[in-house]
C-alpha cells in the first residue's frame, strides 16, 4: 500500500470536502483532530485540522494529480508523454516525452499550450518553434513501413505505444538528471501497459496514468503539440514524395485517396506511407 501527504490550508480542505462529499465516512471519525475522512474505491483520505491531508491505497497516483487539479496546484516540474498519428491511416506514429520545469509553466501558459487539443495544425506549426528551446524533450517517430513490419509480427497498437513511451521517458530522465513526476495520457490500463513491456530490459514504473492528462499538467500538452508538429512534417514530406496531398484521419475521403494511390502506384507504395492494418485498407485490399 502506498501513501502520500499534503499540507493544505482550511479553505483548500473545505473545497476538497465539498468535491468528495459523496465519499465522506462520517461515522468512522472518532478523533477530534480529524477534519474529515473518506473512502473512494480502494483509496482512503484523511484530512486533519492542522492542514495535513493523508492519502493511501494501491493506486493513488491519479488521485494525487486529481487533487492537484482541483486545487489548481500547477507549480511543479514534470515529464509529460503523449502520442499522435494513431488515428491516421497515413503517416508515422510519433511519441514525445517533454520535461517542463515549474519556472517555464507561465511561459507556456501565456502561449495557451494547455489547450493543446483545441489548437489548429496551423497554430501548432507556429507555436512549436517558440517552445522547443525552452523545454527538454525526447521524440521518436515510427514510419508506416516499420509500423507494418511490427504489426505483421503480432504487435498491436497499444504495445507499440507502450514501448515507445517507455523509451522516451527513460531517455528524457537521463537528459534532465533528476526525479520528477511522470504523467502519461492514459490509453490502456496500467496493468496492460506494464504487461506490454515485460520483455523490455528497462522499464520506468513510477508513472501517473491520467485521462485527459494535458489538463493535469502542461508538460503533456507540450509533448502533444511537439509530437503533432513532427507528425505534420512527416505528412508533408510523404505528400511531396508521391505528389499527393495526403489526407489526415480515416474518413471515407481517405478511402478514396487510398484507392487512387493503389491504382496508380500499387500496394508497395501504400506499405511505405500507410498503416496497412487499418480497416480503410484491409476492407479494400486484404481478404481473410
From Swiss-Prot:
Name of the gene this protein is made from: rnhC
Binding site residues for a divalent metal cation: 82-83, 185
Enzyme class: hydrolase
Role: Endonuclease that specifically degrades the RNA of RNA-DNA hybrids.
Reactions catalysed, as given in the entry: Endonucleolytic cleavage to 5'-phosphomonoester
Protein EC: 3.1.26.4
GO biological process: DNA replication, removal of RNA primer; mismatch repair
UniProt record similarity statement: Belongs to the RNase HII family. RnhC subfamily.
Keyword Hydrolase belongs to the record: yes
Keywords of the record: Cytoplasm, Endonuclease, Hydrolase, Magnesium, Metal-binding, Nuclease
Main location: cytoplasm
Subcellular location: Cytoplasm
Names of required cofactors: Mn(2+); Mg(2+)
All residue ranges annotated as the RNase H type-2 domain in the record: 76-288
Protein name: Ribonuclease HIII
